[in-house]
From Swiss-Prot:
<dbReference type="InterPro" id="IPR004424">
    <property type="entry name" value="IspE"/>
</dbReference>
<dbReference type="InterPro" id="IPR020568">
    <property type="entry name" value="Ribosomal_Su5_D2-typ_SF"/>
</dbReference>
<keyword id="KW-0067">ATP-binding</keyword>
<feature type="binding site">
    <location>
        <begin position="101"/>
        <end position="111"/>
    </location>
    <ligand>
        <name>ATP</name>
    </ligand>
</feature>
<feature type="active site">
    <location>
        <position position="10"/>
    </location>
</feature>
<dbReference type="InterPro" id="IPR036554">
    <property type="entry name" value="GHMP_kinase_C_sf"/>
</dbReference>
<comment type="function">
    <text>Catalyzes the phosphorylation of the position 2 hydroxy group of 4-diphosphocytidyl-2C-methyl-D-erythritol.</text>
</comment>
<keyword id="KW-0414">Isoprene biosynthesis</keyword>
<comment type="similarity">
    <text>Belongs to the GHMP kinase family. IspE subfamily.</text>
</comment>
<dbReference type="GO" id="GO:0050515">
    <property type="term" value="F:4-(cytidine 5'-diphospho)-2-C-methyl-D-erythritol kinase activity"/>
</dbReference>
<dbReference type="GO" id="GO:0016114">
    <property type="term" value="P:terpenoid biosynthetic process"/>
</dbReference>
<dbReference type="GO" id="GO:0019288">
    <property type="term" value="P:isopentenyl diphosphate biosynthetic process, methylerythritol 4-phosphate pathway"/>
</dbReference>
<feature type="active site">
    <location>
        <position position="143"/>
    </location>
</feature>
<dbReference type="Pfam" id="PF00288">
    <property type="entry name" value="GHMP_kinases_N"/>
</dbReference>
<dbReference type="InterPro" id="IPR006204">
    <property type="entry name" value="GHMP_kinase_N_dom"/>
</dbReference>
<keyword id="KW-0418">Kinase</keyword>
<keyword id="KW-0547">Nucleotide-binding</keyword>
Length: 268
């Protein structure tokens, strides 16, 4: 058995913080898939023993794919799946050609974890529902459910893990990403530096806005509440941002930016 699949990054068209609840911030966001040059390629094979290979920037125990597999095993046990089904996860050889950067606001590790959970469910024909997959995804990381969903455009609420399909003309082929080299944003540091300016009360209105309308109406500061704190915590990012034109927007807690692809000459 060999299965190979591609996973693509997401961008946040808008990200608005509602309030802090416990240790984390409640938010609303529009997440869109971007199918451009940037992608990871994941290969899953049956082998004699488990292996996970890739150019990862963290120890195995902290890897999103590894975490997803542990959570999946526990879930299958709780649903009384057979011992042989659960053991089959211990003989997977998983290899990732890693191109999507982490700490960039693109869903770096969540992309792979969400894609893996979705595809393993298909490969092994477990017939787990989307809700069951979401229950696992939210334990891996807040963005993971977007990648499990396979939707092209979604509204994300709660801490980012509650996903709802947003019907609109997909922008997946119309956006391009700029991920600065060697500039990484710590999500934790950016959220800690966030200071609410006013109480945000227009969540319902924002969740109805088409993505294209958002990009044509607001600037990057108006769309993403995390841009200011990200610039405060990262001088290298601030230097880059100051050179960018108004057509660039900020994704997640950074450090990546994105824009609508410039219209090609000759109406191509």
């Amino acid at each position: 058995m060999t299965h190979v699949f591609e996973v693509y990054p997401k961008v946040n068209i808008f990200l608005k913080i509602l309030h802090k609840e416990g240790a984390y911030h409640k938010l609303i966001s529009r997440m869109c898939l971007v199918k451009d040059k940037l992608k990871d390629i994941i290969s899953v094979k049956s082998a004699l023993s488990f292996s996970l290979k890739g150019d990862f920037d963290c120890p195995l125990e902290e890897n999103s794919l590894f975490k997803a597999l542990q959570i999946l095993k526990n879930f299958l046990k709780s649903k009384n799946f057979s011992h042989s089904v659960i053991k089959s996860l211990d003989t997977l050889a998983i290899e990732v050609e890693k191109n999507i950067p982490t700490q960039a606001g693109l869903g770096g590790g969540s992309t792979d974890a969400g894609g893996l959970l979705y595809h393993l469910n298909q490969i092994f024909d477990w017939r787990l529902s989307l809700e069951e997959l979401y229950s696992m995804g939210s334990l891996v990381g807040a963005d993971t459910n977007f990648f499990i969903s396979q939707y092209k455009s979604t509204n994300a609420t709660s801490y980012g893990e509650v996903i709802e399909n947003f019907e609109e003309e997909p922008l997946e082929n119309r956006l391009e990403i700029y991920a600065p080299n060697h500039v990484f944003c710590s999500t934790k540091a950016v959220y800690q530096a966030y200071k609410p300016e006013t109480c945000f009360s227009q969540a319902k209105e924002w969740l109805k806005k088409p993505s294209l309308e958002c990009l044509k109406t607001y600037d990057r500061n108006g769309l993403n509440d995390l841009l200011k704190p990200a610039l405060l915590t990262n001088q290298a990012l601030k230097d880059i941002e100051s050179e960018l034109g108004k057509e660039w927007f900020f994704s997640g807690s950074g450090s990546a930016f994105f824009r609508l692809k410039p219209m090609q000459k000759g109406g191509e």
